[in-house]
């Protein structure tokens, strides 16, 4: 009987400690839940700030560096960022982890933003860009044509907000060369006003009638 009393007595404090420990665990669980909510809220705010930009990861490569102790591996990411309204940039990031490499690429792309001259949803005139052994040709297209491009070229054009265009890639099919050739072509575009001012002519003498109509429709002056 004393043994039973001792066991009962021992179980009494244990039973008392059980609810306390359960309460503590629940409290810890509540604290952890609150922490997750705060972190999720922070991520939600960042997502809202970044929602205005379109981000496309073109390619991710693993590279290695031979050192005295062996090999060190890292990752590189080629990223395109644009607002879908004529603003676009290209970035190349390198880090030990893929997410960090992508983030570095996004930051570099935002630093290299440039404006693409557009009329309605296409480019102003045919143009060709080159980078290393890559060559990309771009031609304006009528409304409803869509983006006739593939791979890296399409990523750049869609981030820039170009909806109707014809393209052809020649030479190297390396994604980095193709992307930089596309960017070189877009940077070579000129506005009709710039060409007219340089030649000393009027806008009607320089720009085709179809281009002027498309521009007027885009501006809403022609219904």
UniProtKB/Swiss-Prot annotation:
Cite the Pfam families for this sequence: Ribosomal_S5, Ribosomal_S5_C
Tell whether rRNA-binding is among the UniProt keywords. Answer: yes
Q: Which GO terms describe its biological process?
A: translation
**GO MF terms on file?**
rRNA binding; structural constituent of ribosome
Query: Which segments does the entry list as coiled coil?
Result: none
Q: Which residue stretches does the UniProt record annotate as biased composition, category Basic and acidic residues?
A: 29-42
This chain belongs to which protein, by name?
Small ribosomal subunit protein uS5
């Amino acid at each position: 009987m004393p043994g039973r009393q001792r066991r009962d007595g021992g179980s009494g404090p244990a039973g008392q400690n059980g609810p306390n420990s359960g309460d503590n665990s629940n409290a810890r669980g509540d604290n952890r839940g609150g922490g997750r909510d705060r972190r999720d809220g922070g991520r939600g705010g960042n997502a809202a700030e970044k929602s205005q930009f379109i981000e496309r990861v073109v390619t991710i490569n693993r590279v290695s560096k031979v050192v005295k102790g062996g090999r060190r591996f890292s990752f590189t990411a080629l990223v395109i960022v644009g607002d879908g309204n004529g603003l676009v940039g290209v970035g190349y990031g390198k880090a030990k982890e893929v997410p960090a490499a992508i983030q570095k690429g996004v930051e570099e792309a935002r630093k290299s933003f440039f404006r693409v001259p557009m009329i309605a949803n296409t480019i102003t005139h045919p143009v060709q860009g080159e980078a290393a052994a890559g060559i990309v040709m771009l031609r304006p297209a009528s409304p409803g044509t869509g983006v006739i491009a593939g791979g890296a070229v399409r990523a750049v054009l869609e981030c820039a907000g170009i909806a109707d265009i014809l393209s052809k890639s020649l030479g190297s099919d390396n994604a980095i060369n193709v992307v930089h050739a596309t960017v070189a072509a877009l940077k070579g575009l000129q506005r009709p006003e710039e060409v007219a001012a340089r030649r000393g002519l009027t806008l009607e003498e320089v720009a085709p009638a179809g281009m002027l109509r498309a521009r007027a429709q885009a501006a809403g002056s022609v219904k």
